[in-house]
Amino acid sequence: MATEGDKLLGGRFVGSTDPIMEILSSSISTEQRLTEVDIQASMAYAKALEKASILTKTELEKILSGLEKISEESSKGVLVMTQSDEDIQTAIERRLKELIGDIAGKLQTGRSRNEQVVTDLKLLLKSSISVISTHLLQLIKTLVERAAIEIDIIMPGYTHLQKALPIRWSQFLLSHAVALTRDSERLGEVKKRITVLPLGSGALAGNPLEIDRELLRSELDMTSITLNSIDAISERDFVVELISVATLLMIHLSKLAEDLIIFSTTEFGFVTLSDAYSTGSSLLPQKKNPDSLELIRSKAGRVFGRLAAILMVLKGIPSTFSKDLQEDKEAVLDVVDTLTAVLQVATGVISTLQVNKENMEKALTPELLSTDLALYLVRKGMPIRQAQTASGKAVHLAETKGITINNLTLEDLKSISPLFASDVSQVFSVVNSVEQYTAVGGTAKSSVTAQIEQLRELLKKQKEQA
């Protein structure tokens, strides 16, 4: 239990804090990850204090030396947290005083924990986004390069989980890659706002000591400084934005996972997961469970929950700082950890996935070419609605005869429309089917190749910006 003297603001209070209140108030377990960035921010602030003549050069050197020692202790895992340490900022302040004495107290001159916590979080998320972006771009690259290698594999495309049209396997892979590039772009947009520095905003009114905020920005490698001190210490838009982007990203990853789970079932058999990303059954020895994909799918719900939680926290608070904002770190750091793990697992799954080309070919049943039969008639001059009706009649006739549509005779087809001729046989080819979709974005080989090249160029640009 903290005594009066242990409290950071002990001079105002009499008596001790309820121990349960201390547990509720403490965020030290979550905030230990902020240790290094808090030290970086403190070093920058110390330099600004020296420039403002609040610290002498000797005092600055002592403070920087002490902070370097704390950083070293932290990296070695020997930085001790005490019961009175409410958060990482108070822990570092306490340890600095133990190392260099009362001079440590000067570091907080004109600085509030309100600005410290938001600065620390922004600094940490800045580096975290870079890591997440790297993993995301690697996943996109894996999808794109696999699409390039396996461009000649053709599979059924589905709508409503029912066979629709033949498509290239690569077209399927690229559909997910394209969605993920939008997530990569959104991460870049969030990073722009995260790199706006709030340090120098004080508790809410600003800094009264002529602190050079441009110096702080430069020292911490941020892009700009906040415009208004009240907004700076209270806004958590960047937390909501990052978790929102993560939510969309997890939706896309969940969709990819669900597709592959379906394709890996014995009923489909299109793909086989590597043993490294599968598990067995405790009772059924024949089973190979896609646990990696199921976990990716389920983690989406975890991220969605974090978004709802932080929105509810922010919805209920007034302007400036409130203790409610302590919830931001646990929410966003959990999302960061989830994304970091999920993206690496997803990349592992895609890079080791076995494609069962033969099973895909077997699933390319003739009814998939019914639309092509209609398009054949359209090219002969028949309006599309009439062509669809004629194609439907051909399907019905084949079913009545107990044969597949490609086994209908020319006479059978001519009984439906005189526009059918001997060249209709070319319709019943899955290669010819996919090759007619040459428009930009289509599943023809030329179009898929163009998509691959465009995505490679986009990846280069996004990698430079990550």
From Swiss-Prot:
- Does the entry annotate any disulfide bonds, and if so which pairs? none
Write out the GO MF terms. Answer: argininosuccinate lyase activity; structural constituent of eye lens
Keyword set includes Lyase: no
Tissues with expression: Eye lens.
Q: Which UniProt keywords apply?
A: Eye lens protein
Cellular component (GO) terms are:
cytosol
Q: Does the keyword Metal-binding apply?
A: no
Q: Which residues carry this modification: Blocked amino end (Ala)?
A: 2
Q: How is it modified after translation?
A: The N-terminus is blocked.
InterPro entries in the record: Arg_succ_lyase_C, Argininosuccinate_lyase, Fumarase/histidase_N, Fumarate_lyase_fam, Fumarate_lyase_N, L-Aspartase-like
Specify the superkingdom.
Eukaryota
Question: What processes in GO biological process is this protein linked to?
Answer: arginine biosynthetic process via ornithine; arginine metabolic process
Q: HAMAP family given for it?
A: Arg_succ_lyase
State whether it acts alone or in a complex, and with which partners, per the record. Answer: Homotetramer.
> What does this chain do?
Delta crystallin, the principal crystallin in embryonic lens, is found only in birds and reptiles.
Family recorded in the similarity comment: Belongs to the lyase 1 family. Argininosuccinate lyase subfamily.
Protein's name in the database: Delta-1 crystallin
